[in-house]
Swiss-Prot record:
Involved in peptide bond synthesis. Stimulates efficient translation and peptide-bond synthesis on native or reconstituted 70S ribosomes in vitro. Probably functions indirectly by altering the affinity of the ribosome for aminoacyl-tRNA, thus increasing their reactivity as acceptors for peptidyl transferase. GO terms for molecular function: translation elongation factor activity. Glycosylated ar Arg-32 by EarP: arginine rhamnosylation is required for EF-P function and rescue of polyproline stalled ribosomes. It is found in: Cytoplasm. SMART domains: EFP, Elong-fact-P_C. Belongs to the elongation factor P family. The gene is efp. This is Elongation factor P. GO terms for biological process: peptide biosynthetic process. Glycans are attached at residue 32.
Amino acid sequence: MKTGKELKPGTVLRIDNDPWLVQKAEFTKSGRNSAIMKTKLKNLLTGYKTETVYGADDKLDDVILDRKEATLSFINGDEYTFMDTTDYTMYELNAEDIEAVLPYIEEGMEDVCEAVFFEGRLVSVELPTTISRKVVYTENAARGDTSGKVMKPAKLANGTEISVADFIQIDEWIDIDTRDNSFKGRSKK
């Protein structure tokens, strides 16, 4: 059993005996009302999508999933093909199925992912919590602006934008926390 506040993208719930994948989860807490979790869910059997709100303390039936290590093999349009690192089996997913990790996926990436299976079927892919990516564009630092933690926008090779520290330059490798899309520092790559 999981509570509403424990939901995150990639979690699979059993609702009316169907497996539902949490594609997006946003925790909201206001001063007056109790905390809630706004979620976007996708039925893994029918593909139907819905938005649902759960209370932070609501009890939900989660599903035990099989997990295997996999790497991105290639991208063909909206189809992403992953390969099992132990037996070299190929699995395909649509862009919709991996919407949560799509900003970090790029051709030629070397990160080992975790392929998530429900009853023998690949349902999603989870990335490591920290990944390294190359900055392809960023503005120069503003002179004299050194008060506090100064951030600026940067663009990665796949077009994703992220806020980075002021000292990061073009062609530098950075570490990114995939849980909250935050800049962690320069990569040792």
